[in-house]
């Protein structure tokens, strides 16, 4: 939604002088350039971290604000001693997937950065549908290329859907992106399970009656259907390196540890 700013007095006259000098074609262009210069001077990553810790914004929200990638902002947060709250806080955040699921951008990142991609491929071959908004197609293309360069299977398994992304609004205590809100709306209207590794996005989705689980449900479903994969230790390590929160009891069950 366009933002209107009222400028008058000396500031307005100075802006018009810049136009008169031919430095800008219009006052609007001069204002846009001033705003760009402002953002270039700000430490957007530090401000994004404040949004995350103080305002409880979703990780996607701070990624969008900072202009960083998920990996970039997570690395910055870890360097500041603030691990992201992503993954599953409790076993109830993990379940066996019995039908099609909708992925948010963070979950796409988690899947492709871990061995969940291999599990998702086999589940997809067995009939489980994975949907994602079409706007993440460039992100998926990059992640697939990275996997291919590492010699890993990068066969496509995600089907894209068009979601209606609305304007930026204030959502109260939890700040989520317009895309995240649109995905919650789409999952609710289509009866899909939303896979999100952002605890705050899941909290937002639950408010609207949307079934939502962590991407760790992919591993849970795989183990239920096919048994424990031989590389389960590597799979867990790849998830922890992101770093995803995995409930201890779930990890021990997957590893076959009994107490």
Stretches with model-predicted labels:
Residues 41-66:
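Short, positively charged interaction helices/loops
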Residues 1-7, 19, 81-89:
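Short Lys/Arg-rich basic patches
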Residues 4, 194-196:
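Conserved SAM-binding loop
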Residues 9-29:
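Surface-exposed, Lys/Arg-rich phosphate-binding patches that contact polyanionic backbones
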Residues 215-226:
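Long, charge-dense
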Residues 27-48:
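Short, basic amphipathic alpha-helical segments that act as recognition/interaction helices
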Residues 49, 63-96, 100:
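Charged, low-complexity intrinsically disordered terminal regions and linker tails
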Residues 96-192, 199-204, 208, 220, ...:
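Active-site-proximal, substrate-binding regions of enzyme catalytic domains
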């Amino acid at each position: 939604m366009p933002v209107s700013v009222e400028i008058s007095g000396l500031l307005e006259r100075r802006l018009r002088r810049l136009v008169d000098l031919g430095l800008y074609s219009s006052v609007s262009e001069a204002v846009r350039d001033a705003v760009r210069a402002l953002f270039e001077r700000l430490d957007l990553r530090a401000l994004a971290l404040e949004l995350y810790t103080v305002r409880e914004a979703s990780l996607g929200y701070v990624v969008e604000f900072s202009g960083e990638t998920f990996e970039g902002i997570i690395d910055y947060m870890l360097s500041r001693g603030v691990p992201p709250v992503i993954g599953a806080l409790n076993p109830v955040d993990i379940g066996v997937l019995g039908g099609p699921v909708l992925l948010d951008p963070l979950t796409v990142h988690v899947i492709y950065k871990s061995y969940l991609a291999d599990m998702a491929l086999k589940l997809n071959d067995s009939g489980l549908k994975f949907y994602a908004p079409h706007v993440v197609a460039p992100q998926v293309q990059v992640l697939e290329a990275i996997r291919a360069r590492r010699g890993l299977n990068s066969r496509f398994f995600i089907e894209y859907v068009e979601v209606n992304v609305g304007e930026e609004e204030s959502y109260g205590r939890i700040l989520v992106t317009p895309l995240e809100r649109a995905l919650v709306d789409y999952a609710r209207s289509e009866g899909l399970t939303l896979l999100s590794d952002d605890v705050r996005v899941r909290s937002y989705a639950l408010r609207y009656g949307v079934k939502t689980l962590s991407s760790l449900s992919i591993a849970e479903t795989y183990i239920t259907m096919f048994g424990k994969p031989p590389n389960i230790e590597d799979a867990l390590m790849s998830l922890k390196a992101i770093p995803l929160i995995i409930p201890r009891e779930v990890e021990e069950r997957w590893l076959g540890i009994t107490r």
